[in-house]
């Protein structure tokens, strides 16, 4: 921390802005990183940000995403990143080094261990993109105790009230994001940057402010350096490395840094003359007095006051692990949701669309499935009969009505199987709102029918080629897009995932499933069901079915995840069955990750369940043992698909088929006078081609042959 402070003080004494440079650890190769750090310093860098690679860097543009991917392919971990710092220090690196990145790899490493190892390796502090101060209380305390810096970020969207608190938190400098959006070099600077910096300086006192995002040329450096204490350059350094001839990367970095700032190491590492030394050693004149002391507890209380009243956690799960640019937008969303959740006029409007949606939904006994299982009565809650063919319409309509009250004109969504995308495109068509749906390229391939349905409805469909090209990657791109377009765009997230208040919003609109089930079972059976069953991906239909029964201990809650090829293989999506606690897409929950906190690729025959995370409320129900979760393999899901089709004349979605298999297994263990309700979350016409494609492989496992 002190090293960073002294660096900014020295730059100020020399009447210049500090050059803060970024490179991803292990890019282009781990062996080159210490040389690149030294080259940055020789080229005039005053402070160095070393990026810790992560599989899902939602705040970064394509350039740094690529660098992360390459570093991970080289096997770079947090441990090896710290070794790179040690190696550079041993070879003479003097510049302060900040670790920059995302929280999950750090959380996986262990906060206390991380702080100790970082201090020993020669790291000076942290810039953690998705760890806002509200979520970093213990981490900040550890940093303070260890003399390491926690650098807050401020974005153009940050309100004055929030900015005031963030500036108080800063212990070395403040990182100012020059524009809304993701990282990346640009041809022009934000024209509103002087105004943004003026706002920052209003609250920052004498704390330095360094500006990043979009700086790429010497002119940019000069312009920003004239009004800021530091200038951050990252993406253009990655690009410089990419463009350099093999073996010339280190030299190219040094030359680029020198070009940016017009200086080099020889100019900046001069000996202090006697006058400078005496000036630096002077005692302050008079006795220093203070008018008050602001403690960490005071700051935490101020942060809490910026938020609404809805609890943002379910036990230890939930929270808002997002880039600073989203924080005030989420507060706006929470405030808007608070206004409508208990407003009779809103719910009257919502229910006025029931005839269009196909609600109230149907519930009936599955006679032949019951006979087949030979145990409890099996009932079907028919969300597949809703308009658009799934439960997704419940949430899409509710969030669109909320977005209109917030004054948003455009809607974005992510989708896996396409059902949420279709539901969102449908409500946007009805209300005349522009709609963009992000969908993994692999899901576009296997759900081509739903892609065409979305386009028929007037939506724009963006295929995401990054990563595993599935739902997780669609969420990443949707979040990146939203950060850029907060002013006029609402993100209708499709599952009970994401940062607070999204899990609560989605649960609220999906609870119509469980509320109707409870009422209908009382009418038909005069009692509550003994168990309710739902498939689980992100958890939207499960949380909607389970929540109304969560305080009824006589009702078992069973969630059925995607077991893929089996949870004893790497090819599954069974997050609650086989995952561990971590942070993904803005929320602390169970996730599928490796030992280094990197997110694992997943597999399911069902695109809608092919996701490495799950809603935080479901995670809490798992830990408190309120709900039980099991996994059904692809073959077992096919068995559920076949039985529902051939015994009840209902072709279910492959997602729902997982729940069907789990419910049948449960019903077999129960008494004939007991009742199990399955949430039949969607219809299966979208999956017929997938079943036909996979049947030659899976069919023999379950004795099912439909070849002509």
Curated annotation (Swiss-Prot):
Alphabetized UniProt keyword annotations: Amino-acid biosynthesis, Aromatic amino acid biosynthesis, Lyase, Pyridoxal phosphate, Tryptophan biosynthesis
Gene Ontology BP term (one): L-tryptophan biosynthetic process
CDD domains linked to this entry: Trp-synth_B, Tryptophan_synthase_alpha
Annotated stretches, region: Tryptophan synthase alpha chain: 1-305
Cofactor: pyridoxal 5'-phosphate
Name by which UniProt lists this protein: Tryptophan synthase
Keyword Metal-binding: no
Record family assignment: In the N-terminal section; belongs to the TrpA family.
Name of the gene this protein is made from: trp-3
GO terms, molecular function: tryptophan synthase activity
GO cellular component: a single term: cytoplasm
Catalytic activity annotation: (1S,2R)-1-C-(indol-3-yl)glycerol 3-phosphate + L-serine = D-glyceraldehyde 3-phosphate + L-tryptophan + H2O
Active-site positions on this chain: 49 (proton acceptor), 60 (proton acceptor)
EC annotation from Swiss-Prot or TrEMBL: 4.2.1.20
Entry coiled-coil feature ranges: none
Keyword Nucleus: no
Pathway where this protein functions: Amino-acid biosynthesis; L-tryptophan biosynthesis; L-tryptophan from chorismate: step 5/5
NCBIfam families assigned to the protein according to its UniProt record, in alphabetical order: trpA, trpB
Enzyme class of the recorded protein, top EC level: lyase
Region Tryptophan synthase beta chain, annotated ranges: 306-708
Residues bearing PTM N6-(pyridoxal phosphate)lysine: 392
